[in-house]
Structure formats: structure tokens, C-alpha cells
Regions:
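Substrate-recognition "cap/lid" segment bordering the active-site pocket of phosphatases
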Residues: 114-162
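A metal-dependent, Asp-based hydrolase signature
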Residues: 47-77
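Generic structural signal for small/hydrophobic residues in well-ordered secondary structure
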Residues: 8-11, 53, 99, 108, ...
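Active-site neighborhood of HAD-like aspartate-dependent phosphohydrolases
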Residues: 1-42, 66
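Short, solvent-exposed loop/turn segments at secondary-structure junctions
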Residues: 12-13, 18-20, 112-115, 139-140
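Short, surface-exposed acidic
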Residues: 27-39, 69-80, 160-161
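Short, acidic loop-to-helix structural element flanking the phosphoryl-transfer center
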Residues: 4, 73-107, 118, 146
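Glycine-rich phosphate-binding loop signature in dinucleotide/nucleotide-binding domains
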Residues: 1, 101-104, 156-162
């Protein structure tokens, strides 16, 4: 019997408007797409390192800027102003609340750097319904690796069959 539900944050409980954010900064659509690829599809997986919380925001910014000096202003602004990146999904938040009222345990399992997680969840209504969470920056492990899931289950003594 299902007693607990585990949600991801990004692209589940909130949406990202990363491309529009870069356009708001002053990039055209083509440049915004390219800069997004530079950050999110980086062959060195620098954004994944950022999610793991093993390096400071500033060191991640500096590394990206060193790799892409022509885009350093946009990259620096983008990472430093992550509060503009997320979009609330109130209909999903309402559903989370309904599940909580029905007695389900509600948990978060997500890849996030600490600074962005705090900016994206600070005023999120769904947070009041959360029974526990494991975010990559907390244990320096990320999805899809099983370790982060096991850490969530162990911390909150969740029966994996429920």
C-alpha cells in the first residue's frame, strides 16, 4: 500500500524559465539557447557539480566564465539571480496539499545547489506540506544515483514498499 509520495522539485513542483531569464537579461533567443547549452550540457558536468554542493556558487561562476568568457556577464548574472528562474505551479501545489490531507507522507528528492533551492522554495506553498527532503547539496550525491534515494528513505525511516 502506498503511504508516501516522493516529488522532484524542478519541472515537477516548479517550472524553470531559464531561457526567458537570459532573454530578459538581454540575450537574443539563439544566444540564450547557446548559453543554456554551455551551462546545462557542459561536457565536464559543471552544473551537476553545482547541484552537489561541493563548490561555492562563486567558484562555479568563475569556472563557467573561464570556459566561456564571451558569455561571462550573462552567466554571472544568471547564476547570481536564480530567484527569477522558477515559475510556481499552483495547480500542482494544490494537488500536493490534497494528497497531504488524504494522509500521504510527502517528501522531496531533488538535485539542487543550496542557494537556488532556497531561492526557489522560500515562498513555495507546497513546502508546508513536506514531511522531509533530501536534496543533492545536503549529501553531495545526486539523482539518478540510488544513494540519494536511499539517504531519503534511511533518514525518514521510509519503507521502500510503501
Amino acid at each position: 500500500m502506498i503511504k508516501n509520495i516522493i516529488f522532484d522539485v524542478g519541472d515537477v513542483l516548479i517550472e524553470y524559465r531559464w531561457k526567458q531569464m537570459l532573454v530578459d537579461f538581454g540575450c537574443n533567443e539563439t544566444d540564450a539557447e547557446r548559453i543554456g547549452r554551455e551551462m546545462f550540457d557542459d561536457p565536464d558536468r559543471l552544473w551537476s557539480t553545482f547541484d552537489l554542493g561541493v563548490r561555492s556558487d562563486e567558484s562555479i561562476i568563475e569556472e563557467f566564465c573561464k570556459k566561456h568568457p564571451e558569455d561571462s556577464d550573462a552567466i554571472r548574472w544568471f547564476i547570481s539571480h536564480g530567484e527569477y528562474m522558477h515559475v510556481p505551479r499552483p495547480s500542482v501545489w494544490k494537488r500536493v496539499h490534497e494528497l497531504k490531507e488524504k494522509g500521504y507522507g510527502i517528501y522531496l528528492l531533488s538535485n539542487y545547489p543550496e542557494s537556488l533551492f532556497k531561492k526557489h522554495t522560500e515562498y513555495a506553498d507546497f513546502m508546508k506540506d513536506i514531511d522531509g527532503m533530501m536534496v543533492s547539496y545536503m549529501i553531495h550525491k545526486g539523482k539518478p544515483e540510488r544513494d540519494i534515494y536511499e539517504a531519503l528513505c534511511d533518514k525518514y525511516r521510509l519503507d521502500r514498499s510503501e
